């Protein structure tokens, strides 16, 4: 819940000086990206900008305090301020900020700018007291904000010092409007107008000018001169002499003498007590000060000119001038030290009654009241956890003694979830074990089950599925139905474990249950996770169309609940890319993989490994080996600079081994094979993939017998567990083994099985990646004209993809190849005596690749009649009469030159 006063522009008071010369300068602010108003405290920054902002409807105001260094809090208020300015135009950004569903401030701001692109009128955001921001992450995000904000957007920043916002760069590019302390200082004319408004009897212009010079035009000093003259009935000049040369750091003594000592005891105590509040309203004042009518008292203090300012148009919320408020809080610690804890307790109680638990925690911490802090956490901690107030919760839990946590074990559970959210897995188990050992008496069974649910999540995250399954089952056996969050966690973990064990149907059922529970209780990140898992399971079962439809539901959930910034969004677009790749929709697959990288742009580069692997796959399927090599260099660099889950490594190794196969790099394959781990099992698609990598490397090295043993065992497991997509992949690799080892009949048999299974999976690229060996077999099958209709159609589609992407098949017949061929000792005499032209060599390569006459004409951009002439000439030179004879002749030439066809 946001405090309204932090989003309210200060109210302009009737007696406030209107700074016409400065307002004239600010009137051109819409021509700049940033309007920066800087000066020490008390120079009238806020007053000036509030005057300028008066009458501007499309302006948001955000007043900072020390608590705004928390990124999530800063984001929530900033977006809320822009929502006020735009009348709710940026609803997606608002929802993401409220639910903490963004990867970083930068990514949230990027979404904000997408929405603001549809806002075409001038728009302003004022951020007051920016000097309170010390968090470098926020500084970095605001630099990003300034670089990318729309042209019709002006950011107005008020600060006591020069903020870390790339000011020099903006200044050089003339995108910065600056007002500093020298300009904010009152000149002689303004000082005269000021005193004429504040003093009962006018003073001479020369006297006014002298006083202005004495205090260097400092607005706070001028205000104190007028206040002192009214309270003490002394001359203004006397006060001016006392303030001459003084600055904010030496003001305390003066304020004691001239302000606090000149009000009655009741007012003095009111000022000191109320100063502990960063913002205040009637209810807070009544509780903190004991005054019966807080609103009336605030208005009275305001009339006395005691540096109190209204924070909203309704006059409900007030705050002290920062300089005066800081002074009062310091004096309160000295004068009311004994009462201070009780004052903070009263403030905490009032904030709780008004529904602001985070503000209440601030005062409970200041009071040092562990019992009050504990009670607030017991009632509100999980709500704060779900809104990602993690830093505040961590600070609060550290302030509680361990004994208090043991007496309230749910707070121990909260602390453990905090650790889990920060990936401190070993600390989670240590904390829970210690708590179980030291909790007095018999531990509540439900709480123990909640501990086990969390432990199960930690175990699966840490790569220990057996322990995760044991703990998840224990938790589900003991958890009441009402304990929905822990039941969702345990059900999800159990489903994930079964997925790892290859029990796909039962895993799918549990993930569907998880989705239903998570949707019912609005636990959206688990709902999304369960959909992603369902899609992976359906893909493994070979039901790729069902996987696609599940992904569509997941994308819809992301859109409805504004989950675009969650890292899980990358997981979803990645598995969508895998599916698109399988169906040979390579451009879409690449775009999806790149969008996954964009989601992770604010994370460590190592997180992008999986999407980078997919980019390599796309290049390999296109036959673009140069691009694949470039991407592999980056991938291998990431592999060497991080620790990864085994399935991440398996996917990365897959594209490396395929690249070595396509380039004939046996040395790299042999080196990898010596060092790569060999899993004990192959009962899920992760482990099947790693064993398939091993078999592919063995085939490349000519180790056909061990590769066949591996693949036969993989197929047995895949059939047993219904891992149909893996079976399809295994059959294709087995086909390559048989083909290369000369077992043509076996190769044809398993290829037919693979084509039949592809009717279910829809696989295309898995065939294409095998290149020319696959193309040659498919040509033979098509020529036999015995394939069923669906398999015939798929074979033709695969062949077209190979012909389109794998240009190296006829690139062999380039000038360099032809020159080497003609110099080969075994070249047929007919070719040596009647050499083909370069164009005829190109035509032969395209015939060999399965192109029709029309396709060859299109490829070479010549007329079909010209192609017929080229074909007639090359047939005559080769001594062949039919197209199939030409194909066989080309194949013999390639074999002679050492190409494995």
UniProtKB/Swiss-Prot annotation:
Keywords: Activator, ATP-binding, Carbohydrate metabolism, DNA-binding, Nucleotide-binding, Transcription, Transcription regulation. One of its GO terms (biological process) is positive regulation of carbohydrate metabolic process. Residues 853-872 bind DNA. Activated by ATP and maltotriose, which are both required for DNA binding. InterPro entries: P-loop_NTPase, Sig_transdc_resp-reg_C-effctor, TPR-like_helical_dom_sf, TPR_MalT, Tscrpt_reg_HTH_MalT, Tscrpt_reg_LuxR_C, WH-like_DNA-bd_sf. One of its GO terms (molecular function) is DNA binding. ATP binds at residues 39-46. Disulfide bonds: none annotated. It comes from the Bacteria. Residues 829-894 form the HTH luxR-type domain. Belongs to the MalT family. Positively regulates the transcription of the maltose regulon whose gene products are responsible for uptake and catabolism of malto-oligosaccharides. Specifically binds to the promoter region of its target genes, recognizing a short DNA motif called the MalT box. Monomer in solution. Oligomerizes to an active state in the presence of the positive effectors ATP and maltotriose. NCBIfam families: PRK04841.1. This is HTH-type transcriptional regulator MalT. The gene is malT.
